[in-house]
Amino acid sequence: MIPRPHGGKLVNRIVSSKRRTALLKETHELPSIEISYERLIDLLDIANGAFSPLEGFMVQEDYLHVLYDMRLSNDLPWTIPVILDVDPEEISNVKEGDDIALKYKDEIYAIMRVEEIYGWDKKEYARQVYKTTDPNHPGVAKTYQRKELLLGGTIDLLNQPHHPLEHRILWPIETRVLFREKKWRTIVAFQTRNVPHRGHEYVQKAALTFTDGLFIHPLIGWKKPGDYRDEVIFAAYEALIKHYYPDNVVVLAGLMMNMNYAGPREAVHHAIVRKNFGATHFIVGRDHAGVGDYYKPYEAWEIFDEFPDLGITPLFIREAFYCKKCGGMVNEKICPHGEEYRIRISGTKLREIIKKGITPPEYMMRPEVAKVILSFKDPFVH
């Protein structure tokens, strides 16, 4: 049964076309602030219901509850603060209770009702969210670059930005209809920012054996250098689905969402977001949303013990490897053979092979997938 959205109601903060014309006229009278591309993506996730029950950027009470308790002030699970940072001089003429226009590259995208202006401790944010204050962590580095004050308040979205992959993006209101049309009662979601290798395929198919449908949901948004480009990920998955999945058991759609690399906290966040899209189950990977050695391999599994009231079932499927003796993809639970027979698939090693223009061996990646990736002149983010 498709779950109710987080908090019970799917948020929609998109202004109707009738109201939009009047509000756009009003925006010229309002103070405005320029926001970053990452905050524009947050705006879209709030307005389109991906971040339900949030209706805007967090006020201080919710921010502090999430920071220290991993719950909103109403006790609903929520693990990553969704905040709008500004410099004091940008809001010198703004007070609590005012409406402001939010712009990106001088185009107005939303109106925000400023409920609260408050300060924050970036180092403490990093310590709680990322479990490290090391500026070499990409999420921590981003945090330290953010501005000094935070604005909390509800938003109304006036414009959706164009994106070269917008035809790939579905929002919760669309996926919920789609899953119902397919008559899927159980849907397992798979979060990714990578092209698929045989280990991913193994995990997805293991989950699909006891659910009605698989929802492959790659992130479109800020990625770190060395990650695969969005269009490469989609093309690679299309090849995999075409050649190695039965018809009508997979939905592939993009999600505009920022990647924080916040490990365990972000694993829970990813699950909540997929619940809003209509998923009943969520695959949690080994070192999910991790980076480097900042988190223990299965720390992202353990955190779910703190959230029995999440409303989506996490699936912990062990990392797959190729066993020469078994003759296929297996994991530690089902393979009795020693390490000398096991070939582990490393994403880093795969990248190195692809960077050299070499086709990876079949036990690492399907040849049809490799062919598509290698057809791109440069598959990586710089």
UniProtKB/Swiss-Prot annotation:
Keywords: ATP-binding, Nucleotide-binding, Nucleotidyltransferase, Transferase. InterPro entries: ATP-Sase_PUA-like_dom, PUA-like_sf, Rossmann-like_a/b/a_fold, SO4_adenylyltransferase_pro, Sulfurylase_cat_dom, Sulphate_adenylyltransferase. One of its GO terms (biological process) is hydrogen sulfide biosynthetic process. Its EC number is 2.7.7.4. GO terms for molecular function: ATP binding; sulfate adenylyltransferase (ATP) activity. Gene3D superfamilies: HUPs, Sulfate adenylyltransferase. It catalyses: sulfate + ATP + H(+) = adenosine 5'-phosphosulfate + diphosphate. SUPFAM superfamilies: Nucleotidylyl transferase, PUA domain-like. Pfam families: ATP-sulfurylase (PF01747), PUA_2 (PF14306). Pathway: Sulfur metabolism; hydrogen sulfide biosynthesis; sulfite from sulfate: step 1/3. The keyword Cell division does not apply. NCBIfam families: PRK04149.1, sopT. Belongs to the sulfate adenylyltransferase family. This is Sulfate adenylyltransferase. It comes from Staphylothermus marinus (strain ATCC 43588 / DSM 3639 / JCM 9404 / F1).
